[in-house]
Amino acid sequence: IIDINFYENEEFLKNLKSRCHSCRNLMYEKIKRYALENGFDYICDGNNISDLVADRPGILITYGMEFNTPLIEAKLTSKEIHEYLEKNNIPYSRSTTCLATRIPTNTKITKDKIEKIKKSEKILSKISGCELVKVRNFNKVSVCEINNFSKIINNNSFNELNNQLKLVGYEKVCLNL
């Protein structure tokens, strides 16, 4: 494991439109340095074909640093990879975007905001029963996103969610339907 403290990186904290690019550049520079210092000849990136059509500005770093992309070369999509893993009972964690993406661009990133988002997403996941959740942070307003809101609406769980997220520090809790 390569240790990186993103809170020491001003480009990351500024949260400009180029944040993803700067962040990935920081990570990949450290990975490449480690690989060179330890005699690795081959560095692989886990991006797949689905990542090429998503809004992923940091993906250009992969090619700029000459990392190998075997899943893209094999033309595999996220869906195909997940189906293969499930079919073969290979444990994996569903990917989700960086928590910094929950903070609006040009709004300063702080450790407190990231911790608040992390805590809120654990609460949302527990109450909704959904594995993939997002809580977007708009200062005192949280915007919750999950793939199946019926679990919250049908079970009358919104009041519990509202109360729990207000304890975290939000004044208003919204569902993005």
Model-found features: residue ranges?
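Proline- and acidic/polar-enriched loop/turn elements at helix boundaries
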Residues: 3-4, 47, 94-98, 137, ...
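A short, flexible beta-alpha/helix-coil linker loop
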Residues: 7, 104-106, 149-150
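Mid-to-C-terminal catalytic subdomains of enzymes
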Residues: 72-125, 129-132
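Short beta-strands and strand-loop turn motifs
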Residues: 45-46, 96-102, 144-145
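ATP-dependent adenylation/nucleotidyltransferase module used to activate substrates
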Residues: 1-87, 142, 156-171, 175
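Peripheral terminal appendages
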Residues: 39, 112-177
